[in-house]
């Protein structure tokens, strides 16, 4: 199975797999059962921003999800990613719908990682930024139902021709270049990621959510991972 570390923006509470009984953000380490969650007031039809930070000195993974009106949610969890992830990874965005649905639209996405080496004082860095997504976006690996180019956005899950969200959909987008996330001689490995998103639904319960994830470089969508598994995990263990 793939090795996944993720920050989930979970719009639908699946209490049977340990979710709190409200929309939340969470940190997932190799399991959809979040290690830490925080209540999140998801604003239907409003553009939000997610900012994710990790620094190997503090070994803390943190995320803030906010809206223009100042409403925000924060979650953090202490984890040594050297012990969890392979040295080379890919970073991506994933989203699903299930019985209930929502649009999982990404308007922008940026990422920066840095490795400061002990021996050479060199910094190995990777940076990318998408302020819009073209129809033929060559530097993204699209999986499942993900498409680019509609209004310059990335649609992670299926929408109809008039933009209505469809159920039982899963899609992911990964940056094409592998990221050197840690190495034994590095003093500090750090990264930060930011994406802006629009979740819109006419359902009384929008579902299921968006996640920023880091995985082994050959990661693919597990079969049956629509809905509560967020396109990341093969089961709810």
UniProtKB/Swiss-Prot annotation:
Keywords: Calcium, Lectin, Manganese, Mannose-binding, Metal-binding. Ca(2+) binds at residues 10, 12, 14, 19, 208. Pfam families: Lectin_legB. A carbohydrate binds at residues 12, 14, 99-100, 228. Transmembrane segments: none annotated. CDD domains: lectin_legume_LecRK_Arcelin_ConA. SUPFAM superfamilies: Concanavalin A-like lectins/glucanases (SSF49899). Mn(2+) binds at residues 8, 10, 19, 24. One of its GO terms (molecular function) is D-mannose binding. PROSITE patterns: LECTIN_LEGUME_ALPHA, LECTIN_LEGUME_BETA. Binds one manganese (or another transition metal) ion and one calcium ion. The metal ions are essential for the saccharide-binding and cell-agglutinating activities. PANTHER family: CONCANAVALIN A-LIKE LECTIN FAMILY PROTEIN, LEGUME LECTIN DOMAIN-CONTAINING PROTEIN. Belongs to the leguminous lectin family. D-mannose/D-glucose-binding lectin. Has anti-inflammatory activity in animal models when applied intravenously. Has antinociceptive activity in mice when applied intravenously. Homodimer and homotetramer. Oligomerization is pH-dependent with homotetramers forming at pH 4 and above. This is Lectin alpha chain. It comes from Canavalia boliviana.
């Amino acid at each position: 199975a793939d090795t996944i570390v993720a920050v989930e923006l979970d719009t639908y509470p699946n209490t049977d797999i340990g979710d709190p009984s409200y929309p939340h953000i969470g940190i997932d380490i190799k399991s959809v059962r979040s290690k830490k969650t925080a209540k999140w007031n998801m604003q239907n039809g409003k553009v939000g921003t997610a900012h994710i930070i990790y620094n190997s000195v503090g070994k803390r993974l943190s995320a803030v999800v906010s809206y223009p009106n100042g409403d925000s949610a924060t979650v953090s969890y202490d984890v040594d990613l050297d012990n969890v992830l392979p040295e080379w990874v890919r970073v991506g965005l994933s989203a699903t719908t299930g019985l209930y649905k929502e649009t999982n639209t990404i308007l922008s996405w940026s990422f920066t990682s840095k490795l400061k080496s002990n021996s050479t004082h060199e910094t190995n860095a990777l940076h990318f930024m998408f302020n819009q997504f073209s129809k033929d976006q060559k530097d993204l690996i699209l999986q499942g139902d993900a498409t680019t180019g509609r209004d310059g956005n990335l649609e992670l899950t299926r929408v109809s021709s008039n933009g209505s969200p469809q159920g039982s959909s899963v899609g992911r987008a990964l940056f094409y270049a592998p990221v050197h996330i840690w190495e034994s001689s590095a003093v500090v490995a750090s990264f930060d990621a930011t994406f802006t998103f629009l979740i819109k639904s006419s359902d009384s319960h929008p579902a299921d959510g968006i996640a920023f994830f880091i995985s082994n470089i050959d990661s693919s969508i597990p079969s049956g991972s629509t809905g509560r598994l967020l396109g990341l995990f093969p089961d709810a263990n």
